[in-house]
Amino acid sequence: MEPEYYLDEKDSILWNALVGVVLVAVCGALSGVMKKIPAWALHLLAVLGAVTAVILGIRLARAAGAESIADQYYVQRAAMALADGDAEWVLAQDYYGIYPFQLGLAGSTERLVIQQVQAVCGGITLYVGFRIVRELSGSRAAELLYLVAELLFLPVYCYALFIYGESIGTCSVLCAIWCYLMANRPEGKVWQKGLLWSAVALFMGLAYATRNVLLVVWIAMVIMQILVLLRSKKWQGLPALCVVLAVMLLGKTTLCHMAEGQLDREYGSGAPYVLWVAMGMQENPDALKGPGTYNDYNLDTYLQAGYDSIEAAEVAKGDIRQCLAKWQEDPVAAVTFLKEKLLIQWIEPTYCSFNQTRYQYRPQGWVEDLYTGQANERALAFLNRFQGMVYLAVFGYYLRILLGKLKGVQVLPGIIFLGGFFITILWEAKSRYVYPYIVMILPSAACSMEYYGRLLAGGIGRIAGGIASSRERKQKQKEIGRTA
């Protein structure tokens, strides 16, 4: 099976900055024009955009005939085996446990069924992101910018083909964030807030069941509620988040017990997550894959421990201690390792979406072109520029936080994004793990671009007004001179 390689390509910071200035200027022009557009028109556009995203995702799924590879293969194999009472695949790793039931919801183990469901998740993600923009800023220009950006973000469609938790988990966690923002509105009745917090629990439970690492979002919400408590003395959110955590853990436990009902032995805890942390600290012997990337360490160690989670965890902890001792002796090597590990995850513009869905059975011509032809080259160039603009906007977003321009729940996406960044330091290195955090930060990035666009437009307006006033004064002085 072909491994995941990466290549270094130099980019122009100056060119990215120039494109960024042009985009900010366009946003500034849009800001004035969009004020005349009614809110319902943007809402209708968001619905149409969501439907378009669903259609495009389904169209790609039906035209690609994507085959299951790597983790996807194991997920599907485990689901099908468990349906026949074979527990071996599920026992290997606990996160497989969700997928037999995920596939069972559709009454089929066919890939296309799940891919089409995930395409629907892509449409829901777009619409919910639009509503998040409305909660964060209420700017119609920002809403339009977000809709365009999300529609053009190709990984959303590619991950509809990916039989794993990316599409469903990202969609669920975005829904949870939206409900969380509404629950923290200053207005609203108690029963309304209760329903919203219940929705947060439901969506976070689903997100956690599909992608455990999305626990980061719950932690960010707790930090946010502590900040709310310190600022406004409102404490109700913290007990609500305790209930949310209970639902998340109970949901995962329930799935495990449901799996045990189909097995002849206990489900077990699976491979301990510390194995992934230990693997993420290792130099990969395959230089083309980069440091901290997958090297079979986690499963090999777990198998050698005889599926004993405790013994495997002790081995991993020992390897982590050795690595930390080596870095303590050579801090420069540690910095170099971490720098390269972060770069191969955060500057890869497709976020592994093409790589993870590239195995296809008789794809249609346009799909083949998108993955291997000239369309692929154009897509990579576009996504590279897209990524540069997103990071530029994110930088502007954090600058606004530092300057005190953003307060309250507007800071939540920034806390989540930082949490995702720290996770990629600790975990196995793979740009796929960055994808959910890019989707979650896009609403704030759109708001940031629109904000600086308004600043630029206002500055240009003041300069133009000053020049016009100066000309008028000079003209009046000339007229006074002639009269005298």
Regions found by a protein language model. Give the residues of each.
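Transmembrane-helix signature of polytopic, membrane-embedded enzymes
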Residues: 129-154, 171, 407-413
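Membrane-proximal stem/loop segments at transmembrane-domain junctions that anchor or position
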Residues: 260-360
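Membrane-interface anchor segments at the N-terminal boundary of transmembrane helices
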Residues: 11-16, 112-113, 340-413, 417
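Membrane-interface alpha helices of multi-pass inner-membrane proteins
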Residues: 147, 196-211, 222-223, 244-248, ...
